[in-house]
């Protein structure tokens, strides 16, 4: 019992010494990781936003046929399951090629 009190004091001092919070840890300017909607919109200028949207439209128009077929297959659950086993090309041919009239 006599050795318990000095041991508890020693443990408390060790915790205080190891858990000391220095001033350096408070120097971070990221007090809050979240930002307001107004500040979020200032990162990208309207011209850059317009350019990015235009590029996305161009990419959508110039997609390869295989990617368009895969997206159509992804939207249909049975086709997607079939594609996991036999591949997207075979799945698209099975579920969608007949509907378009091609053989």
Curated annotation (Swiss-Prot):
<keyword id="KW-0217">Developmental protein</keyword>
<dbReference type="GO" id="GO:0048306">
    <property type="term" value="F:calcium-dependent protein binding"/>
</dbReference>
<keyword id="KW-0301">Gamma-carboxyglutamic acid</keyword>
<keyword id="KW-0732">Signal</keyword>
<dbReference type="GO" id="GO:0051592">
    <property type="term" value="P:response to calcium ion"/>
</dbReference>
<feature type="signal peptide">
    <location>
        <begin position="1"/>
        <end position="19"/>
    </location>
</feature>
<keyword id="KW-0892">Osteogenesis</keyword>
<feature type="modified residue" description="4-carboxyglutamate">
    <location>
        <position position="67"/>
    </location>
</feature>
<dbReference type="InterPro" id="IPR002384">
    <property type="entry name" value="Osteocalcin/MGP"/>
</dbReference>
<dbReference type="GO" id="GO:0005615">
    <property type="term" value="C:extracellular space"/>
</dbReference>
<dbReference type="InterPro" id="IPR027118">
    <property type="entry name" value="MGP"/>
</dbReference>
<dbReference type="GO" id="GO:0001503">
    <property type="term" value="P:ossification"/>
</dbReference>
<dbReference type="GO" id="GO:0065003">
    <property type="term" value="P:protein-containing complex assembly"/>
</dbReference>
<keyword id="KW-0964">Secreted</keyword>
<dbReference type="GO" id="GO:0009612">
    <property type="term" value="P:response to mechanical stimulus"/>
</dbReference>
<feature type="modified residue" description="4-carboxyglutamate">
    <location>
        <position position="60"/>
    </location>
</feature>
<feature type="modified residue" description="Phosphoserine">
    <location>
        <position position="25"/>
    </location>
</feature>
<comment type="similarity">
    <text>Belongs to the osteocalcin/matrix Gla protein family.</text>
</comment>
<dbReference type="InterPro" id="IPR035972">
    <property type="entry name" value="GLA-like_dom_SF"/>
</dbReference>
<feature type="disulfide bond">
    <location>
        <begin position="73"/>
        <end position="79"/>
    </location>
</feature>
<dbReference type="GO" id="GO:0030154">
    <property type="term" value="P:cell differentiation"/>
</dbReference>
<feature type="modified residue" description="4-carboxyglutamate">
    <location>
        <position position="21"/>
    </location>
</feature>
<dbReference type="GO" id="GO:0030324">
    <property type="term" value="P:lung development"/>
</dbReference>
<dbReference type="GO" id="GO:0051216">
    <property type="term" value="P:cartilage development"/>
</dbReference>
<dbReference type="GO" id="GO:0030500">
    <property type="term" value="P:regulation of bone mineralization"/>
</dbReference>
<feature type="modified residue" description="4-carboxyglutamate">
    <location>
        <position position="71"/>
    </location>
</feature>
<keyword id="KW-0891">Chondrogenesis</keyword>
<comment type="function">
    <text>Associates with the organic matrix of bone and cartilage. Thought to act as an inhibitor of bone formation.</text>
</comment>
<keyword id="KW-0597">Phosphoprotein</keyword>
<protein>
    <recommendedName>
        <fullName>Matrix Gla protein</fullName>
    </recommendedName>
</protein>
<dbReference type="GO" id="GO:0032991">
    <property type="term" value="C:protein-containing complex"/>
</dbReference>
<feature type="domain" description="Gla">
    <location>
        <begin position="51"/>
        <end position="97"/>
    </location>
</feature>
<keyword id="KW-0221">Differentiation</keyword>
<dbReference type="GO" id="GO:0048754">
    <property type="term" value="P:branching morphogenesis of an epithelial tube"/>
</dbReference>
<dbReference type="GO" id="GO:0005509">
    <property type="term" value="F:calcium ion binding"/>
</dbReference>
<feature type="modified residue" description="4-carboxyglutamate">
    <location>
        <position position="56"/>
    </location>
</feature>
<dbReference type="GO" id="GO:0031012">
    <property type="term" value="C:extracellular matrix"/>
</dbReference>
<feature type="modified residue" description="Phosphoserine">
    <location>
        <position position="22"/>
    </location>
</feature>
<dbReference type="InterPro" id="IPR000294">
    <property type="entry name" value="GLA_domain"/>
</dbReference>
<dbReference type="GO" id="GO:0051384">
    <property type="term" value="P:response to glucocorticoid"/>
</dbReference>
<dbReference type="GO" id="GO:0007584">
    <property type="term" value="P:response to nutrient"/>
</dbReference>
<dbReference type="GO" id="GO:0009725">
    <property type="term" value="P:response to hormone"/>
</dbReference>
